[in-house]
UniProtKB/Swiss-Prot annotation:
Residues 94-97, 326-363, 942-955, 1029-1041, 1092-1108 are extracellular. Its EC number is 7.6.2.1. Mg(2+) binds at residues 866, 870. It is a multi-pass membrane protein. The lineage of its organism: Eukaryota, Viridiplantae, Streptophyta, Embryophyta, Tracheophyta. The chain crosses the membrane at residues 72-93, 98-120, 304-325, 364-381, 922-941, 956-975, 1006-1028, 1042-1064, 1071-1091, 1109-1133. This is Probable phospholipid-transporting ATPase 11. It comes from Arabidopsis thaliana (Mouse-ear cress). It catalyses: ATP + H2O + phospholipidSide 1 = ADP + phosphate + phospholipidSide 2. Belongs to the cation transport ATPase (P-type) (TC 3.A.3) family. Type IV subfamily. It is an enzyme of class 7 (translocase). Pfam families: Cation_ATPase, PhoLip_ATPase_C, PhoLip_ATPase_N.
Length: 1203
């Protein structure tokens, strides 16, 4: 590519807007009006007029807090959690005389938990702060007003500054391109940081500025004004005018260089700062993704509210009883106070028998504080710690690392780990997600002749379906075996056209035009390796790159592009030698989703004007001239065959353009592109529509987007897990169906329910152009087809058959199916089918379908995609998984979890998802179990003491229970436990349904753990009380008091809750042993150390262990007996459950324990305990065969009964 500046060249108007004197008849009404009020004084950032505008500076802050706001704002964030707020209230109440314990013992645990969360917030925010400092201190050359550019920090830039950005530097703000190192003011930009796309974009300045501003010194006298739109988040549009040298020139997105994009393949550019800081488009787009919370977390909130209700109910009951007892105290004893030790004569206390109602009210507040231990204060912070550690395991899983691209899995948020184990429906994009998005040119049709002998994966799959033998596939592999190195983007084999043999074909002239079109009709950028001389290409899409590579392999090598021309080498038909040709590039009629085609207008070396065009078959065939349809019939046949083979097709055509016609077109085209009106795009489309007509057909291309490695096996395994899989794609129905067969999403035995609008009646209405009639007929047709499909499902269900159905619907039909009146019908039909494929669906439709499934089923949905068109779907789903593939990183940046290949979804869900769900479920249940155990002992002791608000335990015993003596084991459970190993998660994928049906966190299981806690507390309290009631506790004749009873009960609680944890764990690691037995040991260590402190601090715990508990045999015997008795119910329940109604994971654990894990009969027996039959994938095919033959059915039933 030419690097020097070229002067006095005739500049074309290819990509941008030709600088010209203003036509004041144009509509400039937007500029200066609402939404278009920005005025930029170029080269005068400090002028009074500019200062009055008061635009924001270029300093960017992404931090959540400032130094001044951190403490108040982070405290507010912490106390928004209802549990934290509750503990704050109880902490404040502890400062009053109502408190049953010392204030410091109440406030210290809360302070610890809040401080831990705030430290986490501070660390995360400091990371953002460091990024801000690094970015704001970057340097760029800024014009000082005297023709000299000096390096300044990004943070100091102002609107109106002129900057010089050099190769491989980032743009510091949104800049208006004035000129570049190229004479015609083009530059190449990489927008990876904006939209994730790695291909280069072409930008071009106005001719007026590029011809006047060449060197640094040219900017000394620059005076210009930009009037444009106000700051907004739209990355793809920009409207404004430049007032320069008495001209008013229209501006578009082509002249705008966006902050954080990078200058590539261009030595330097000059630009004027238009938007700064938080006004730039990239920052305007930096909104937080939608906040997502897992179902378990939302249910946990409900449990917290339930516990609040229990606490207040207990406090209310205790207060009523206390009030009655206080009033009856004197009545029963003839006016004498029986409980004299409560000192009712003391005005500072609240137990006056003469004021019993007030005593009850005061007691209520005391009880609320005393029973606060029912609420697990460390639950939230423990779960956050566990989820972060779980995310680290996901991120560092070597089995989800894609070495080829150096891409590991990345959990971008840890909030949804357990949700990965509850997915009911997967909604997947196709291109780049199920397929590689690495296009290979494999076949083509030229002049009605089909070329290319390659066999696609879909054709191989179709052959296997038809013949039912893997030998067919083996034979096909031999056919496509090729010698020589693999060429990226090219997998074509046909000796008739390779190595220059195309010149010997009957239609060599047509073949030459076809290959020339591939070499010229594109926007690819060539890059030549100076060492080897080989040419590689930067293209806007993998398809386009494949076309250019194919042209090169056919002997038409595109090797250079300038703003005005395209250069390529080809084999000359006349001389038989390779020659270089240069076509002058006049216009590029760019592709968009509405046009479904792109064209270029070029002038060849003979001076002829040519329109070269490629596009979708449905828009290209209708634009053919009468004399251009010579090969149409054969080409249509070949296109249909290619679609059946799962290939992506484009039609190639051309025509010669009359000189006068082009002059008129160029005039109208330039006026349309230079207009500053809201309908600019429609004007351009209207003009190009007139040019892209009367085309002469050359042929069609067929490129294969191969399935990613492991996709069929992954889909098969997910289907065995009972997960439904929907595919939402923009491809044609035929292509999507055949890809569905190739990846086993569809199978031969399935009945296909196809909904489309290809009926003769609707086609006739379309030809007549009756819009209202078309809409009415289309809506009616879609509804009728849905009702017919539902009737098929109902009939199959009533017949108790094993038929599986697949729903396939196109984008037009989907528009009507998603209407409010019919979407429930559509959802009922779709959820009754084993597979759903939505074809020709738009990004908006993908998001709407995802929303419908999520809200309509109430189950967890996962969306997976790789492109910008999948962002809405990813954000709408409960979990968004981004594929870090070829289409850039925009999907990844909008996702919750990123993986490199679809096949990693199997391990992410079946292993990590199941483990995280199982761990978090057990962890939360255990948290409430241990707190109920501890809290009920406090309640029982208070009831035993006539609700006198006397705590059963020392203040510090109360405070440290949740923090030091019981939290670490439960955190270890949440991080390390495995109910079954990864191997068995794969072997028995139906285990995953435990999460889908939420069996491990059902209300039945939660309530069961709560009752277990209540029983444990009852056993501990009454056994300890009765064991110590009438005994002499030491040689001096002293009986057990509160400190001894409390110490014994506390010891039993610590032992029992930790032993219960040990019994609940399925997979022990050395770390779990350390934290469980270490927590118990730490209790004894703490008791000795705390008891050795002065009595003024340790109060009744002073030497209680050394002098009272440890020497007494009854203490140790009671502890041992209570532990045994309190854990018996759990043993009994587990034994009965394992014997009579085992969970799925328990069945797997048992056959592994019995040594039957490798016995095919036992393995198949467990699989037969399906919660949901497998209806897609290879396994479904085998299962269908088994059902038809009835093999092993009776034997499996016998085996299960015996088991």
């Amino acid at each position: 590519m030419t690097k020097c500046r070229r002067r006095r060249l005739h500049l074309s108007n290819i990509y941008a807007f030709k600088g010209r004197k203003s036509n004041f008849q144009e509509d400039h009404s937007h500029i200066g009006g609402p939404g278009f009020s920005r005025v930029v004084y170029c080269n005068e950032p400090n002028s009074p007029a500019a200062e009055r505008r008061n635009y924001v500076g270029n300093y960017v802050r992404s931090t959540k807090y400032t130094l001044a706001s951190f403490i108040p704002k982070s405290l507010f964030e912490q106390f928004r959690r209802v549990a934290n707020f509750y503990f704050l209230v109880t902490g404040v109440l502890s400062l009053t005389a109502l408190s049953p314990y010392s204030p410091i013992s109440a406030l210290l645990p809360l302070t610890f938990v809040i401080a831990a969360s705030m430290v986490k917030e501070a660390i995360e925010d400091w990371g953002r702060k460091k990024q801000d400092i690094e970015m704001n201190n970057r340097k760029v050359k800024v014009h000082d007003g005297n023709g000299i550019f000096r390096r300044e920090g990004w943070r100091d830039l102002k609107v109106g500054n002129i900057v010089r950005v050099e190769k491989d530097e980032f743009f510091p703000a949104d800049l208006l391109l004035l000129s570049s190192s190229y004479e015609d003011s083009i530059c190449y930009v990489e927008t990876m940081n904006l939209d994730g796309e790695t291909n280069l974009k072409v930008k071009q300045g106005l001719e007026a500025t590029s011809s006047a501003l060449h060197e640094d010194s040219d900017f000394k006298e620059l005076k210009a004004v930009v009037k444009c739109e106000d700051p907004n988040a739209d990355l793809y549009t920009f409207v404004g005018t430049l007032h320069f040298e008495e001209q008013r020139l229209p501006l578009s997105i082509t002249q705008l260089l966006l902050r954080d994009s990078k200058l590539r393949n261009t030595e330097y550019i000059y630009g004027v700062v238009v938007f700064t800081g938080h006004d730039t488009k990239v920052i305007q787009n930096s909104t937080d993704p939608p906040s997502k919370r897992s179902r378990i977390e939302r249910k946990m909130d409900k449990i917290i509210y339930l516990m609040f209700g229990v606490v207040f109910l207990m406090s209310f009951i205790g207060s009523i009883v206390f009030g009655i007892e206080t009033r009856e105290d004197r009545v029963r004893n003839g006016g004498r106070t029986e409980r004299w030790y409560l000192r009712p004569d003391n005005a500072d206390i609240f137990f006056d028998p003469d004021r019993a109602p007030m005593a009850a009210v005061y007691h209520f507040f005391t009880a609320v504080m005393l029973y606060s231990y029912f609420i697990p204060i460390s639950l939230y912070v423990s779960i956050e710690i566990v989820k972060v550690l779980q995310s680290l395991f996901i991120n560092n899983d070597i089995l989800m690392y894609y070495e080829e691209n150096d891409k590991p899995a990345h959990a971008r948020t840890s909030n949804l780990n357990e949700e990965l184990g509850m997915v009911d429906t997967i909604l997947s994009d196709k291109t780049g997600t199920l397929t590689c998005n690495s296009m290979e040119f494999i076949k083509c049709s030229i002049a009605g002749t089909a070329y290319g002998r390659g066999i696609t994966e879909v054709e191989r799959s179709m052959a296997m379906r038809s013949n039912g033998s893997s030998l067919v596939g083996d034979d096909l592999d031999v056919v496509v075996d090729q010698s020589g190195p693999k060429i990226k983007g090219f997998n074509f084999l046909d000796e008739r056209v390779m190595k220059g043999n195309w010149v010997k074909q009957r239609d060599a002239a047509v073949l030459q035009k076809f290959f020339r079109l591939l070499a010229v009709c594109h926007t690819a950028i060539p890059e030549t390796d100076e060492a080897t001389g080989s040419v590689s290409y930067e293209a806007e899409s993998p398809d386009e790159a494949a076309f250019v590579v194919a042209a090169r392999e056919f002997g038409f090598e595109f090797f250079s592009r300038t703003q005005n021309g395209i250069s390529f080498r080809e084999l000359d038909l006349a001389s038989g030698k390779t020659v270089e040709r240069v076509y002058r590039l006049l216009n590029v009629l760019e592709f968009n989703s509405a046009r479904k085609r792109m064209s270029v207008i070029v002038r060849d070396e003979d001076g002829r004007l040519l329109l070269l065009s490629k596009g979708a078959d449905n828009v290209m065939f209708e634009r053919l001239a009468k004399n251009g349809r010579k090969f149409e019939e054969k080409t249509r046949e070949h296109v249909n065959e290619y679609a059946d083979a799962g290939l992506r097709t484009l039609i190639l055509a051309y025509r010669e353009v009359d000189e006068n016609e082009y002059i008129e077109f160029s005039k109208n085209f330039n006026e349309a592109k230079n207009s500053v009106t809201a309908d600019r795009e429609s004007l351009i489309d209207e003009i190009t529509e007139q040019m892209e007509r009367d085309l002469i057909l050359l042929g069609a291309t067929a490129v294969e987007d191969k399935l990613q490695n492991g996709v069929p096996d992954c889909i098969d395994k997910l289907a065995q897990a009972g997960i439904k899989i929907w595919v939402l794609t923009g491809d044609k129905m035929e292509t999507a169906i055949n890809i569905g067969f190739a990846c086993s999403l569809l199978r031969q035995e399935m009945k296909q329910i196809i909904i489309n609008l290809e009926t003769p009646h609707i086609k006739a209405l379309e030809k007549a152009g009756e819009k209202d009639a078309i809409e009415h007929a289309s809506r009616e047709s879609v509804v009728n087809q849905m009702e017919e499909g539902k009737a098929l499902l109902t009939a199959s269900s009533s017949a108790s058959s094993h038929e599986a159905f697949a729903l396939i619907i196109d984008g037009k039909s989907l528009t009507y199916a998603l209407e409010d009146d019919f979407k429930k019908k559509f959802l009922d039909l779709a959820t009754g089918c084993a597979s759903v494929i939505c074809c020709r669906s738009s990004p908006k439709q993908k998001a709407l379908v995802t929303r419908l499934v999520k809200s309509g089923t109430g189950k967890t949905t996962l969306a997976i995609g790789d492109g910008a068109n999948d962002v809405g779907m990813l954000q709408e789903a409960d979990i968004g998984v981004g594929i870090s593939g070829v289409e850039g990183m925009q999907a990844v940046m909008s996702s919750d979890i990123a993986i490199a290949q679809f096949r990693y979804l199997e391990r992410l869900l079946l292993v990590h998802g199941h483990w995280c769900y199982s761990r978090i479920s057990s962890m939360i249940c255990y948290f409430f179990y241990k707190n109920i155990t501890f809290g009920v002992t406090v309640f029982l002791y208070e009831a035993y003491t006539s609700f006198s608000a006397q705590p059963a335990y020392n203040d510090w015993f109360l405070s440290l229970f949740n923090v030091f003596f019981s939290s670490l084991p439960v955190i270890a459970l949440g991080v390390f436990d495995q109910d079954v190993s990864a191997r068995y998660c794969y072997k028995f994928p139906l285990l995953y349904q435990e999460g889908v049906q939420n069996l491990l966190f059902s209300w039945k299981r939660i309530i069961g753990w709560m009752f277990n806690g209540v029983f444990t507390a009852l056993a501990i309290f009454f056994l300890c009380k009765e064991s110590l009631k009438h005994q002499l506790y030491n040689p001096n004749g002293k009986t057990a008091g509160r400190e001894i009873l409390g110490g014994t009960m506390y010891t039993c609680v610590v032992w029992v809750v930790n032993l219960q944890m040990a019994l609940a764990i399925s997979y022990f690691t050395w770390l779990q042993h350390i934290v469980i037995w270490g927590s118990v040991a730490f209790w004894y260590i703490f008791l000795m150390i705390y008891g050795a402190i002065t009595p003024s601090f340790s109060t009744d715990a002073y030497k209680v262990f050394i002098e009272a508990l440890a020497p007494a045999p009854s203490y140790w015997l009671t502890t041992l007996f209570v532990m045994f008795f309190a854990l018996i119910p759990f043993f009994v329940f587990k034994s009965v459950q394992m014997r009579f109604f085992p969970g799925y994971h328990q069945m797997i654990q048992w056959i592994r324990y019995e040594g039957h894990s490798n016995d095919p009969e036992f393995v198949e027996m467990v699989r037969q305990r399906s919660i949901r039959p497998t209806t897609v994938g290879f396994t479904a095919r085998r299962a269908a065969s088994v059902r038809r033959s009835g093999r092993f059915h009776d034997q499996l039933n016998k085996n299960f009964i015996a088991f």
